[in-house]
Amino acid sequence: MKILWITSVYPSSMKPGEGVFHETQVQELQKLGLDITVICPRPFHSAPVRMLKKTYRKKDVRPEYEIRKGIPVYRPFYRAVPGQLKWAQPHRRIASAVLKTMKQRDLYPDLIHAHFAMPSGGAAAVVSESAQIPYVLTLHGSDVNVYPHYSKGAFKAFKRAVGSASVVLAVSHKLQEEAKKLSGFDSSVLPIGIQLSRFQGNEETKEEIRKRLGLPLDQRLAVYVGRLVREKGIFELSEAIESLQDSPKAVFVGDGPAKSTLTQKGHIVTGQVPNHQVRDYLLAADLFVLPSYSEGMPTVVIEALALRVPVICTDVGGVSSLFGKHQHLLIKPKSAQALAEAITRYEHEQIWKPEVADDLYETVQAQFDAGKNAKALHHQYQTVTKTSV
Protein backbone atom coordinates (compact mmCIF):
# COMPACT_ATOMS: atom_id res chain seq x y z
CA MET A 1 0.00 0.00 0.00
CA LYS A 2 1.35 3.40 -1.02
CA ILE A 3 0.67 6.24 1.42
CA LEU A 4 1.40 9.94 0.85
CA TRP A 5 1.86 11.97 4.01
CA ILE A 6 1.26 15.73 3.87
CA THR A 7 2.54 17.64 6.88
CA SER A 8 4.01 21.02 7.72
CA VAL A 9 6.70 19.56 10.01
CA TYR A 10 9.06 16.63 9.48
CA PRO A 11 12.71 16.07 10.47
CA SER A 12 15.45 16.88 7.99
CA SER A 13 19.21 16.56 7.85
CA MET A 14 19.43 20.26 8.74
CA LYS A 15 16.70 20.23 11.42
CA PRO A 16 16.57 16.69 12.81
CA GLY A 17 14.53 17.68 15.86
CA GLU A 18 11.59 19.15 13.94
CA GLY A 19 8.46 16.98 13.98
CA VAL A 20 10.16 13.88 15.39
CA PHE A 21 6.80 12.45 16.45
CA HIS A 22 5.86 12.15 12.77
CA GLU A 23 9.02 10.27 11.95
CA THR A 24 8.38 7.92 14.87
CA GLN A 25 5.04 6.92 13.36
CA VAL A 26 6.39 6.67 9.82
CA GLN A 27 9.19 4.36 10.97
CA GLU A 28 6.67 2.07 12.66
CA LEU A 29 4.45 2.03 9.56
CA GLN A 30 7.48 1.20 7.43
CA LYS A 31 8.11 -1.86 9.63
CA LEU A 32 4.61 -3.04 8.68
CA GLY A 33 5.57 -3.01 4.99
CA LEU A 34 3.87 0.23 3.99
CA ASP A 35 5.39 2.37 1.23
CA ILE A 36 5.43 5.90 2.69
CA THR A 37 6.34 9.14 0.91
CA VAL A 38 6.32 12.46 2.76
CA ILE A 39 5.61 15.87 1.24
CA CYS A 40 6.39 18.70 3.65
CA PRO A 41 5.59 21.98 1.84
CA ARG A 42 7.53 25.02 2.99
CA PRO A 43 6.61 28.70 2.71
CA PHE A 44 8.33 31.13 0.38
CA HIS A 45 7.79 34.89 0.65
CA SER A 46 7.94 37.17 -2.38
CA ALA A 47 10.55 39.95 -2.52
CA PRO A 48 8.20 42.76 -1.34
CA VAL A 49 7.00 40.65 1.60
CA ARG A 50 10.57 39.77 2.61
CA MET A 51 11.20 43.47 3.17
CA LEU A 52 8.54 43.58 5.90
CA LYS A 53 10.11 41.28 8.45
CA LYS A 54 13.53 39.80 9.17
CA THR A 55 12.16 36.29 9.66
CA TYR A 56 10.67 36.41 6.15
CA ARG A 57 14.18 36.92 4.77
CA LYS A 58 15.63 33.91 6.55
CA LYS A 59 16.76 31.27 4.09
CA ASP A 60 15.20 27.82 4.40
CA VAL A 61 18.19 25.49 4.49
CA ARG A 62 16.24 22.25 4.48
CA PRO A 63 16.89 20.11 1.38
CA GLU A 64 14.24 20.06 -1.34
CA TYR A 65 14.51 16.27 -1.46
CA GLU A 66 16.18 13.65 0.67
CA ILE A 67 15.89 10.00 1.63
CA ARG A 68 15.58 10.03 5.40
CA LYS A 69 15.81 6.66 7.15
CA GLY A 70 14.53 5.01 4.01
CA ILE A 71 11.66 7.47 3.49
CA PRO A 72 11.53 9.87 0.49
CA VAL A 73 10.84 13.39 1.75
CA TYR A 74 9.95 16.25 -0.62
CA ARG A 75 9.82 19.91 0.43
CA PRO A 76 8.38 22.01 -2.40
CA PHE A 77 7.94 25.74 -1.89
CA TYR A 78 4.56 27.45 -1.91
CA ARG A 79 3.85 31.18 -1.88
CA ALA A 80 3.12 32.43 1.63
CA VAL A 81 1.58 35.70 2.76
CA PRO A 82 1.74 37.36 6.20
CA GLY A 83 -0.93 36.17 8.63
CA GLN A 84 -2.10 33.55 6.15
CA LEU A 85 -3.71 31.25 8.73
CA LYS A 86 -5.90 34.18 9.77
CA TRP A 87 -6.79 36.01 6.57
CA ALA A 88 -5.44 34.27 3.48
CA GLN A 89 -5.72 30.51 3.97
CA PRO A 90 -2.79 28.81 2.20
CA HIS A 91 -4.39 25.40 1.57
CA ARG A 92 -4.92 25.92 -2.17
CA ARG A 93 -1.38 27.20 -2.68
CA ILE A 94 -0.02 24.25 -0.69
CA ALA A 95 -2.21 21.85 -2.66
CA SER A 96 -0.80 23.23 -5.93
CA ALA A 97 2.74 22.55 -4.69
CA VAL A 98 1.77 19.02 -3.64
CA LEU A 99 0.02 18.22 -6.93
CA LYS A 100 2.99 19.55 -8.90
CA THR A 101 5.37 17.34 -6.91
CA MET A 102 3.12 14.32 -7.40
CA LYS A 103 3.12 14.89 -11.16
CA GLN A 104 6.85 15.56 -11.45
CA ARG A 105 7.80 12.57 -9.29
CA ASP A 106 5.16 10.15 -10.62
CA LEU A 107 3.58 9.66 -7.21
CA TYR A 108 0.37 7.62 -7.32
CA PRO A 109 -0.59 6.87 -3.73
CA ASP A 110 -3.52 4.72 -2.66
CA LEU A 111 -4.20 7.05 0.23
CA ILE A 112 -3.24 10.46 1.61
CA HIS A 113 -2.64 11.06 5.32
CA ALA A 114 -2.67 14.73 6.30
CA HIS A 115 -1.46 15.98 9.67
CA PHE A 116 -3.00 19.09 11.25
CA ALA A 117 -6.35 20.29 9.87
CA MET A 118 -4.73 23.60 9.02
CA PRO A 119 -3.05 23.99 6.67
CA SER A 120 -2.23 20.41 5.60
CA GLY A 121 -5.76 19.05 6.01
CA GLY A 122 -7.22 21.79 3.85
CA ALA A 123 -4.58 21.11 1.21
CA ALA A 124 -5.34 17.38 1.37
CA ALA A 125 -9.02 18.10 0.69
CA VAL A 126 -8.07 19.94 -2.52
CA VAL A 127 -5.57 17.26 -3.59
CA SER A 128 -8.07 14.51 -2.80
CA GLU A 129 -10.74 16.12 -4.96
CA SER A 130 -8.33 16.78 -7.82
CA ALA A 131 -6.58 13.38 -7.83
CA GLN A 132 -9.56 11.31 -6.64
CA ILE A 133 -7.59 9.86 -3.73
CA PRO A 134 -9.17 9.50 -0.26
CA TYR A 135 -7.48 11.04 2.75
CA VAL A 136 -7.15 10.43 6.46
CA LEU A 137 -6.72 13.44 8.75
CA THR A 138 -5.01 13.51 12.15
CA LEU A 139 -5.77 16.40 14.50
CA HIS A 140 -2.90 17.34 16.81
CA GLY A 141 -3.84 20.34 18.95
CA SER A 142 -3.38 23.90 17.73
CA ASP A 143 -5.25 23.03 14.54
CA VAL A 144 -8.35 22.58 16.73
CA ASN A 145 -7.73 24.73 19.80
CA VAL A 146 -6.17 27.81 18.19
CA TYR A 147 -6.30 28.29 14.42
CA PRO A 148 -10.06 27.84 13.74
CA HIS A 149 -10.77 30.73 16.12
CA TYR A 150 -8.64 33.22 14.17
CA SER A 151 -11.34 34.26 11.71
CA LYS A 152 -14.44 33.13 9.82
CA GLY A 153 -12.19 32.09 6.94
CA ALA A 154 -10.03 30.02 9.26
CA PHE A 155 -13.07 28.29 10.75
CA LYS A 156 -14.43 27.54 7.29
CA ALA A 157 -11.09 26.01 6.24
CA PHE A 158 -11.02 23.90 9.41
CA LYS A 159 -14.55 22.60 8.90
CA ARG A 160 -13.88 21.67 5.29
CA ALA A 161 -10.67 19.83 6.17
CA VAL A 162 -12.46 17.76 8.81
CA GLY A 163 -15.67 17.24 6.86
CA SER A 164 -14.02 16.07 3.64
CA ALA A 165 -11.77 13.41 5.20
CA SER A 166 -12.66 9.72 4.95
CA VAL A 167 -11.47 9.21 8.52
CA VAL A 168 -10.56 11.77 11.18
CA LEU A 169 -8.24 10.84 14.05
CA ALA A 170 -7.49 12.88 17.17
CA VAL A 171 -4.48 12.36 19.42
CA SER A 172 -6.55 12.71 22.62
CA HIS A 173 -10.13 12.44 23.89
CA LYS A 174 -10.14 16.13 24.79
CA LEU A 175 -9.23 17.02 21.21
CA GLN A 176 -11.87 14.63 19.90
CA GLU A 177 -14.53 16.37 21.98
CA GLU A 178 -13.44 19.85 20.92
CA ALA A 179 -13.34 18.89 17.23
CA LYS A 180 -16.87 17.47 17.46
CA LYS A 181 -18.08 20.63 19.18
CA LEU A 182 -16.55 22.86 16.50
CA SER A 183 -17.27 20.89 13.35
CA GLY A 184 -20.13 18.54 14.17
CA PHE A 185 -18.09 15.63 12.78
CA ASP A 186 -17.00 12.52 14.66
CA SER A 187 -13.41 11.31 15.01
CA SER A 188 -11.56 8.40 16.58
CA VAL A 189 -8.83 8.71 19.20
CA LEU A 190 -5.43 7.39 18.17
CA PRO A 191 -2.27 8.84 19.75
CA ILE A 192 1.05 8.50 17.96
CA GLY A 193 2.96 7.25 21.00
CA ILE A 194 6.65 6.67 21.51
CA GLN A 195 9.08 3.83 20.86
CA LEU A 196 8.85 2.35 24.35
CA SER A 197 12.00 0.26 23.93
CA ARG A 198 14.06 3.48 24.00
CA PHE A 199 12.72 4.27 27.46
CA GLN A 200 13.34 0.99 29.26
CA GLY A 201 16.02 0.77 31.93
CA ASN A 202 19.16 2.82 32.33
CA GLU A 203 22.71 1.72 33.05
CA GLU A 204 24.05 5.15 34.04
CA THR A 205 23.40 6.97 37.29
CA LYS A 206 21.95 10.48 37.30
CA GLU A 207 25.35 11.83 38.34
CA GLU A 208 27.09 10.08 35.43
CA ILE A 209 24.55 11.45 32.96
CA ARG A 210 24.96 14.98 34.31
CA LYS A 211 28.75 14.72 34.04
CA ARG A 212 28.46 13.63 30.43
CA LEU A 213 26.07 16.49 29.62
CA GLY A 214 28.11 19.08 31.52
CA LEU A 215 25.28 19.82 33.97
CA PRO A 216 25.70 20.80 37.65
CA LEU A 217 26.13 17.84 39.99
CA ASP A 218 25.26 19.64 43.22
CA GLN A 219 22.03 21.42 42.22
CA ARG A 220 18.44 20.36 41.72
CA LEU A 221 17.45 20.69 38.08
CA ALA A 222 14.10 21.68 36.56
CA VAL A 223 14.30 20.74 32.88
CA TYR A 224 12.21 22.10 30.02
CA VAL A 225 12.38 20.59 26.51
CA GLY A 226 10.93 22.32 23.46
CA ARG A 227 10.92 25.45 21.34
CA LEU A 228 12.03 28.59 23.15
CA VAL A 229 8.98 30.68 22.34
CA ARG A 230 6.56 32.63 24.53
CA GLU A 231 3.64 30.28 23.85
CA LYS A 232 5.47 27.45 25.58
CA GLY A 233 5.30 29.32 28.90
CA ILE A 234 9.06 29.64 29.19
CA PHE A 235 8.97 33.18 30.57
CA GLU A 236 6.54 32.15 33.30
CA LEU A 237 8.89 29.29 34.17
CA SER A 238 11.84 31.69 34.29
CA GLU A 239 9.89 34.07 36.52
CA ALA A 240 8.78 31.25 38.81
CA ILE A 241 12.34 29.98 39.27
CA GLU A 242 13.60 33.50 39.98
CA SER A 243 10.86 34.10 42.57
CA LEU A 244 11.81 31.13 44.75
CA GLN A 245 14.48 31.51 47.42
CA ASP A 246 15.60 27.90 47.32
CA SER A 247 14.84 27.17 43.69
CA PRO A 248 16.13 24.46 41.37
CA LYS A 249 18.33 25.45 38.46
CA ALA A 250 16.37 25.82 35.22
CA VAL A 251 17.66 23.96 32.17
CA PHE A 252 16.08 24.91 28.84
CA VAL A 253 16.70 22.26 26.18
CA GLY A 254 15.90 23.61 22.74
CA ASP A 255 16.28 26.62 20.49
CA GLY A 256 14.21 29.60 19.47
CA PRO A 257 13.91 33.39 19.62
CA ALA A 258 13.99 33.51 23.44
CA LYS A 259 17.35 31.77 23.70
CA SER A 260 19.46 34.88 24.34
CA THR A 261 16.97 36.32 26.85
CA LEU A 262 16.95 33.12 28.91
CA THR A 263 20.75 32.89 28.76
CA GLN A 264 21.09 36.48 29.99
CA LYS A 265 18.90 35.61 32.97
CA GLY A 266 21.46 33.01 34.04
CA HIS A 267 19.56 29.87 33.09
CA ILE A 268 21.24 26.92 31.40
CA VAL A 269 20.25 26.93 27.71
CA THR A 270 21.56 24.01 25.66
CA GLY A 271 20.34 24.97 22.20
CA GLN A 272 19.00 22.31 19.86
CA VAL A 273 20.09 18.78 20.80
CA PRO A 274 19.74 15.51 18.85
CA ASN A 275 16.45 13.79 19.59
CA HIS A 276 18.14 10.74 21.12
CA GLN A 277 19.74 13.03 23.72
CA VAL A 278 16.38 14.31 25.04
CA ARG A 279 16.14 11.10 27.05
CA ASP A 280 19.42 11.93 28.79
CA TYR A 281 18.23 15.40 29.81
CA LEU A 282 15.02 13.92 31.19
CA LEU A 283 16.98 11.38 33.23
CA ALA A 284 19.23 14.17 34.52
CA ALA A 285 16.21 16.13 35.77
CA ASP A 286 14.72 16.28 39.24
CA LEU A 287 11.63 17.81 37.64
CA PHE A 288 10.42 18.06 34.08
CA VAL A 289 8.35 21.18 33.39
CA LEU A 290 6.16 21.93 30.36
CA PRO A 291 4.13 25.12 30.98
CA SER A 292 2.63 25.50 27.48
CA TYR A 293 -0.36 27.68 26.68
CA SER A 294 -1.64 25.06 24.22
CA GLU A 295 -0.77 21.45 23.35
CA GLY A 296 -2.26 18.40 21.69
CA MET A 297 -0.68 15.36 23.30
CA PRO A 298 2.93 16.41 24.01
CA THR A 299 5.35 13.60 23.24
CA VAL A 300 7.98 14.82 25.67
CA VAL A 301 5.54 14.48 28.60
CA ILE A 302 4.87 10.88 27.58
CA GLU A 303 8.63 10.27 27.42
CA ALA A 304 9.16 11.76 30.88
CA LEU A 305 6.40 9.59 32.36
CA ALA A 306 7.89 6.51 30.66
CA LEU A 307 11.10 7.29 32.57
CA ARG A 308 9.16 7.93 35.81
CA VAL A 309 10.43 11.52 35.95
CA PRO A 310 8.19 13.89 38.01
CA VAL A 311 6.24 16.17 35.65
CA ILE A 312 4.78 19.65 36.14
CA CYS A 313 2.53 20.48 33.22
CA THR A 314 -0.26 22.89 32.39
CA ASP A 315 -3.81 21.61 31.99
CA VAL A 316 -4.04 22.04 28.23
CA GLY A 317 -4.97 19.84 25.28
CA GLY A 318 -5.07 16.13 25.98
CA VAL A 319 -2.81 16.20 29.04
CA SER A 320 -5.73 15.83 31.46
CA SER A 321 -6.83 12.58 29.78
CA LEU A 322 -3.24 11.33 30.01
CA PHE A 323 -3.05 12.11 33.74
CA GLY A 324 -6.51 10.68 34.43
CA LYS A 325 -7.22 10.50 38.16
CA HIS A 326 -4.02 12.46 38.80
CA GLN A 327 -5.07 15.47 36.71
CA HIS A 328 -5.33 17.52 39.92
CA LEU A 329 -1.54 17.79 39.64
CA LEU A 330 -1.87 19.88 36.48
CA ILE A 331 -1.72 23.67 36.74
CA LYS A 332 -3.34 26.56 34.92
CA PRO A 333 -1.37 28.09 32.02
CA LYS A 334 0.13 31.59 31.87
CA SER A 335 0.78 31.74 35.63
CA ALA A 336 4.26 32.10 37.11
CA GLN A 337 2.71 31.91 40.57
CA ALA A 338 1.05 28.56 39.83
CA LEU A 339 4.39 27.24 38.57
CA ALA A 340 6.25 28.48 41.64
CA GLU A 341 3.67 26.90 43.96
CA ALA A 342 3.81 23.61 42.05
CA ILE A 343 7.61 23.48 42.20
CA THR A 344 7.49 24.14 45.95
CA ARG A 345 4.87 21.44 46.49
CA TYR A 346 6.76 18.89 44.42
CA GLU A 347 10.00 19.54 46.27
CA HIS A 348 8.77 19.99 49.84
CA GLU A 349 5.42 18.21 50.09
CA GLN A 350 6.43 15.20 47.98
CA ILE A 351 3.13 15.11 46.10
CA TRP A 352 4.70 13.06 43.29
CA LYS A 353 4.33 9.78 45.14
CA PRO A 354 5.57 6.39 43.88
CA GLU A 355 1.99 5.28 43.15
CA VAL A 356 1.51 8.37 40.94
CA ALA A 357 4.63 7.55 38.95
CA ASP A 358 3.56 3.89 38.69
CA ASP A 359 0.02 4.70 37.52
CA LEU A 360 1.18 7.12 34.84
CA TYR A 361 3.92 4.74 33.73
CA GLU A 362 1.32 2.01 33.23
CA THR A 363 -0.90 4.40 31.26
CA VAL A 364 1.97 5.16 28.90
CA GLN A 365 2.77 1.47 28.47
CA ALA A 366 -0.85 0.62 27.69
CA GLN A 367 -1.86 3.53 25.44
CA PHE A 368 1.24 5.09 23.91
CA ASP A 369 3.17 2.25 22.29
CA ALA A 370 4.03 3.65 18.84
CA GLY A 371 4.28 0.17 17.34
CA LYS A 372 0.85 -0.92 18.54
CA ASN A 373 -0.72 2.38 17.54
CA ALA A 374 0.84 2.14 14.06
CA LYS A 375 -0.92 -1.21 13.59
CA ALA A 376 -4.21 0.46 14.49
CA LEU A 377 -3.45 3.20 11.96
CA HIS A 378 -2.64 0.60 9.31
CA HIS A 379 -6.07 -0.92 9.94
CA GLN A 380 -7.65 2.50 9.36
CA TYR A 381 -5.75 2.81 6.08
CA GLN A 382 -7.01 -0.61 4.96
CA THR A 383 -10.60 0.23 5.84
CA VAL A 384 -10.52 3.49 3.88
CA THR A 385 -8.92 2.01 0.76
CA LYS A 386 -11.40 -0.90 0.71
CA THR A 387 -14.46 1.32 1.06
CA SER A 388 -13.25 3.85 -1.52
CA VAL A 389 -12.84 1.31 -4.32
Swiss-Prot record:
Tell me, using the record's free text, what induces this protein: By phosphate starvation, via the PhoP/PhoR two-component regulatory system.
Molecular functions (GO terms) = glycosyltransferase activity
**Highest taxon, organism lineage:** Bacteria
UniProt keyword annotations, A-Z = Cell wall biogenesis/degradation, Glycosyltransferase, Stress response, Transferase
Under NCBIfam families, the record lists:
TeichurnBiosyTuaC
What is the name attached to this protein's record?
Putative teichuronic acid biosynthesis glycosyltransferase TuaC
Tell me its family: Belongs to the glycosyltransferase group 1 family. Glycosyltransferase 4 subfamily.
Question: What other note does the entry give for this protein?
Answer: The nature of the anionic polymer present in the cell wall of B.subtilis depends on phosphate availability. Under phosphate-replete growth conditions teichoic acids are present, whereas under phosphate-depleted conditions, at least part of the wall teichoic acid is replaced with teichuronic acid, a non-phosphate containing anionic polymer. The synthesis of teichuronic acid is accompanied by degradation of teichoic acid and reutilization of liberated phosphate for other cellular processes such as nucleic acid synthesis.
What are the GO BP annotations of this UniProt entry? Answer: cell wall organization; teichuronic acid biosynthetic process
Among PANTHER family, the record links this protein to: SULFOQUINOVOSYL TRANSFERASE SQD2, TEICHURONIC ACID BIOSYNTHESIS GLYCOSYLTRANSFERASE TUAC-RELATED
Q: Which gene encodes it?
A: tuaC
Per its UniProt record, what Gene3D superfamilies does this chain match?
Glycogen Phosphorylase B (3.40.50.2000)
EC top class, in one word? transferase
